[in-house]
Amino acid sequence: MGTGRLPNLHDSGAMTPPPTPTKGSHSKSDSASSLRGSFDSVRRGNAITYRCKPSIDEKETPGSTEPRHFPYWTTDYEIEVDHKGRKRPLGCGAWSNVCRATPRPPKLEGLAPLNTVPGVDMTPPVTPVHSRNSSRSEAQVPQIPSAYAVKEPCGRTAQRVLGDECRILSYLSRYPDAEKYIVPFYGQDTRTDALVLGLMDGTLEDWIQKDLDSLSEESRAAKLAHVFPTLAAHLLDGFIWISEKHCTHGDLKPANILISSTPSSATSTSTSPPHAVYTDFSSAILSTSSTSSSPVGGATYDFLDPALMTKASASTLPTPQTDLWSLAVTLLVLAIGSSPYSRVTSNEFMKKECIKQGTPLAYMRQGENGTRNGKRMDALEGSLGFDVEEWLGLVLVKDVMKRAGVDKWRAELGSGGAKMGLRI
């Protein structure tokens, strides 16, 4: 999404397989029947968990950048199409199209020998069984959801981009709490190079447009005040979690944050703030990888740190500090409902010059939406009893040396939350 892009820029309930079956104890039809039974459960809305061979699990150690491959020899999916058999993309980008897919059993008849699948030993598909003693963390156990989002590459360059993104998602997904902060990742399909991800309700950009801006100003203000502190705190915690893994996202914006309105925990209710996770790591950089290269993906101008827009910074790569700027602009957009540079959207050159000034808080009050933006910010602050604009201004200052670090910024939000009677 966005208007312009810069080039370059598992407990006792686990389900585990029995020992490798012999020809007399595990026939092909038995395996297919068991798999179909499992998928019937998925179609009823249940997620099932299965465990791969130990030789595969060893690669799931936190810190490993070994690409995670989607186990289509055990479970497969089918891209949803319209009545004419055409794929219906959920979203389209510079490098890929994302389509909705439904889990289904693998086509055993046409399955290639498993010893030809990268990283897989020659063993028949396993039947999920209940294990009483499971020591692996749930974060390392693949689950079959009710639906996938399949990110398919567009062209050869896109294959490289998705390959790099696969390594970063594989790396991050192996750490505990990954699914709290990043999109669920099931692996790369080696048949097509597509990335198989968890399906969410939509993006933060969609949520702002459909769930906030469609309301009356009074209702919008009330709903925003209810969700803003918790959502901002969660996104900041996710930002810190990713940064601690030595990863820089490189393209933070509402379109790259996925939202789920479904209660995510036992304490969640239908009125709880939506759960948000980061997605689209096509522009990300992993500083721990000795084989990492400059990202081919790009960043979106409206959310780009002005420090990356000078001639001297032409070859400069994104950093956690530039990511923090992008997150701050993202939260500003959440507050006011549009880009602070919306008044110059039609003039790309002028917009770039405005962004270089490093004063998005000043620009948000200008143009035909300026008055509305100011009223929305004032209403949010009045409802919360917290100076949101001043808080955003701790980061949204052009001079990098004068910006607050992420720890201070998070602490200030926590202090503000305490004044609101919130623990965030």
Where are these regions (language model features)?
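ATP-binding glycine-rich loop module of kinase domains
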Residues: 95-167, 171
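Juxta-kinase regulatory segment immediately upstream of eukaryotic protein kinase catalytic domains
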Residues: 2-89
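Short beta-strand micro-motifs within the conserved protein kinase catalytic domain, predominantly
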Residues: 184-193
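Activation segment signature within eukaryotic-like protein kinase domains
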Residues: 231-232
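Protein kinase catalytic-loop region centered on the HRD/HxD motif
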Residues: 235-247
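Conserved C-lobe activation region of Hanks-type protein kinase-like domains
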Residues: 309-325, 329-377
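Activation segment/activation loop of eukaryotic-type protein kinase catalytic domains
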Residues: 255-303
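Conserved short submotifs of the Hanks-type protein kinase catalytic core
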Residues: 192-203
